[in-house]
């Protein structure tokens, strides 16, 4: 019986836990998930320096983690202990639970090492109430002329219930979507559907390079945000719902002057 570990690395190097390093050190194969999310300063070379000793490192894209997961199960069946190391938390906004289920069905031991995710970090930094967040959603790059309306519809549903929406931004072929690009996509959807989900005068919150020394978190109007320089990626956005008076007061501390 082998061990499959899902290891959350946190959102930057300073949030990698001792438990994460210990688990990786006890693995024969470390699969670094570079598809699900990005960090401002964690990459496979950082893991090589943190984890001592000889072992195999694999940089995994979507094809391995979702479409060819049998290869990971095969490693376990051959007696190798395998860790999948993910930015943030290994099970928040990922599909890795399917691997745990399959490994368990085949008689292997499974472990989960939680990490600080951008989801909880952003909520804390935004000063908004954690109880008032609805479903999160990813804004994806357009495909030819097709723009996926899912984020627009999720924001609409959340706003109708007075809830805030966290928008994850797409990562495709090593290119991370910027907050500016995401907002332009949403405004195009607003032009098409005209359901008053997002207006240029709405206040939003944008986080950039969260967890790193140069992180930024700014509240500003959509019309300002579309051309604002948020710096290097990764970026993430909150579309607020109805603000409690304490939230409205607190948000002033991060409001762009």
Swiss-Prot record:
GO terms for biological process: methylation; protein histidyl modification to diphthamide. Pfam families: TP_methylase (PF00590). S-adenosyl-L-methionine binds at residues 11, 89, 92, 117-118, 169, 210, 235. Pathway: Protein modification; peptidyl-diphthamide biosynthesis. Keywords: Methyltransferase, S-adenosyl-L-methionine, Transferase. The keyword Cell membrane does not apply. InterPro entries: 4pyrrol_Mease, 4pyrrol_Methylase_sf, 4pyrrole_Mease_sub1, 4pyrrole_Mease_sub2, Dphthn_synthase. It catalyses: 2-[(3S)-amino-3-carboxypropyl]-L-histidyl-[translation elongation factor 2] + 3 S-adenosyl-L-methionine = diphthine-[translation elongation factor 2] + 3 S-adenosyl-L-homocysteine + 3 H(+). Transmembrane segments: none annotated. CDD domains: DHP5_DphB (cd11647). Its EC number is 2.1.1.98. GO terms for molecular function: diphthine synthase activity. Belongs to the diphthine synthase family. Homodimer. HAMAP family: Diphthine_synth (MF_01084). S-adenosyl-L-methionine-dependent methyltransferase that catalyzes the trimethylation of the amino group of the modified target histidine residue in translation elongation factor 2 (EF-2), to form an intermediate called diphthine. The three successive methylation reactions represent the second step of diphthamide biosynthesis. PANTHER family: DIPHTHINE METHYL ESTER SYNTHASE, DIPHTHINE SYNTHASE. This is Diphthine synthase.
């Amino acid at each position: 019986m082998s061990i499959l570990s899902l290891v959350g690395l946190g959102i930057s190097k300073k949030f990698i836990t001792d438990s994460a390093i210990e688990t990786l050190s006890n693995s024969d194969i470390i699969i670094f998930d570079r598809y699900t999310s990005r960090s401002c300063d964690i990459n496979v070379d950082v893991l090589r320096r943190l984890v001592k000793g000889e072992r195999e490192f694999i940089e995994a894209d979507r094809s391995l983690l979702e479409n060819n997961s049998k290869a990971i199960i095969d490693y376990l069946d051959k007696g190798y202990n395998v860790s999948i190391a993910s930015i943030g938390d290994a099970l928040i906004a990922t599909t890795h639970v399917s691997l745990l289920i399959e490994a368990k069905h085949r008689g292997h031991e499974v472990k989960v090492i939680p990490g600080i995710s951008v989801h909880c970090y952003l909520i804390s930094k935004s000063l908004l109430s954690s109880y008032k967040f609805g479903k999160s959603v990813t804004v994806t790059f357009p495909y030819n002329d097709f723009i996926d309306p899912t984020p627009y519809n999720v924001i609409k549903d959340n706003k109708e219930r007075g809830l805030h929406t966290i928008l994850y931004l797409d990562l495709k072929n090593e290119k991370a979507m910027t907050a500016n690009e995401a907002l332009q996509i949403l405004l195009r959807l607003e032009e098409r559907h005209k359901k008053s989900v997002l207006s240029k005068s709405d206040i939003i919150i944008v986080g950039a390079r969260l967890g790193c020394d140069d992180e930024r978190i700014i509240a500003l109007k959509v019309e300002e945000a579309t051309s604002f320089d948020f710096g290097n990626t990764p970026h993430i956005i909150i579309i607020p719902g109805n603000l409690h008076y304490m939230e409205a007061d607190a948000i002033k501390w991060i409001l762009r002057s």
